[in-house]
Amino acid sequence: MLKFTEEHEWLKIDGDVATVGITEHAAGQLGDLVFVELPEAGSTFSKGDTAATVESVKAASDVYCPLDGEIVEANQAIVDDPSLVNSDPQGAAWFFKLKLADPDAAKALLDEAAYKELVA
């Protein structure tokens, strides 16, 4: 199941684990990324908490945790090469995997059609 937030994160949900990243729209707005800071595995976050930080040539921005949960994995590849976020934001450049405290809460997030309407 693919879901989106109004803060421009995407979530690919598989059971009780969500893979989280930023959308193509967000990556395009940021411009070329030069730095990514990710949360550590084992960290817990509530919905809306700052979970990661990205810096581009234009600005620094926070990436918010879309739902309550625990980080089970972070994508070291985008720390090593932040430009991956610009080239494949909704694929190889995922940010972290989140074990959801309440998987049903994802139903309240935007579907792809609603997100496309938001950024149109």
Swiss-Prot record:
This is Glycine cleavage system H protein. The glycine cleavage system catalyzes the degradation of glycine. The H protein shuttles the methylamine group of glycine from the P protein to the T protein. InterPro entries: 2-oxoA_DH_lipoyl-BS, Biotin_lipoyl, GCV_H, GCV_H/Fam206, GCV_H_sub, Single_hybrid_motif. Pfam families: GCV_H (PF01597). The glycine cleavage system is composed of four proteins: P, T, L and H. The lineage of its organism: Bacteria, Pseudomonadati, Pseudomonadota, Alphaproteobacteria, Hyphomicrobiales. PANTHER family: GLYCINE CLEAVAGE SYSTEM H PROTEIN, GLYCINE CLEAVAGE SYSTEM H PROTEIN-RELATED. Keywords: Lipoyl. CDD domains: GCS_H. The keyword Ubl conjugation does not apply. The modification N6-lipoyllysine is found at K58.
